[in-house]
Amino acid sequence: MVEIEIEPHEEFEGVYWAIFEDGRKKPATENLVPGHQVYGERLVEYDGKEYRVWEPRRSKLAAMIMNGMEYFPFEEGSKVLYLGAAAGTTPSHVSDIIKESGVEYCVEFASRMMQELIPVCEKRPNMIPILGDATKPHGYAPLVEQVDVIYQDIAQPKQAEVVADNAEAFLRPGGYVIVAIKARSIDVTKEPEEVFEDEERKLEERGFEVLEVIDLEPYERDHVGIVAEYHG
């Protein structure tokens, strides 16, 4: 059996490194629901606790961590709005980090994905599944309180506008957004760098201070993660 060691991340609360025998490492989180996997991820017992290896090819947030992310606004007790929750892969790791005292509103538009997301949420009391359209935040406004962080991973053209509209509705002043930007979803005719700069500018025009832009290569092609603070 391959021995895997677990060490806390140098800076990020609730994030760990799973260190393999050959020296490779991947992010990990302590499992809020021991014994349960979400997407076939590896479970590791270490010092009496169970950890879930966080696969960067399955999660853009894990890819950001692998690629040197500097700002990580999640912590125990955080209130999070997750736009584009899909089947719950990344949201489940966020759930591990914010623990029982946090809450994560998981908005997903596709009913087929929702069928996969709901069983994940049923096992994790801090995850609330919401069938909704991220472009129409008023549709789920009665269900969502003010949050500390908005994480967005949606493949559609107006990504900066969507996260800004949601921030106006739900994000506390001084809160943070993390946006996974896919250039080809926004404009296939432009170079990715140009698309990313356009999205940064749109965020700044809507009251955000962009803190960092993280290239997601080699895990995702033509993607970046943008972390920004909201000043309203």
From Swiss-Prot:
It comes from the Archaea. PROSITE patterns: FIBRILLARIN. The keyword Lipid biosynthesis does not apply. InterPro entries: Fibrillarin (IPR000692), Fibrillarin_CS (IPR020813), SAM-dependent_MTases_sf (IPR029063). Disulfide bonds: none annotated. Gene3D superfamilies: Phosphorylase Kinase, domain 1, Vaccinia Virus protein VP39. This is Fibrillarin-like rRNA/tRNA 2'-O-methyltransferase.
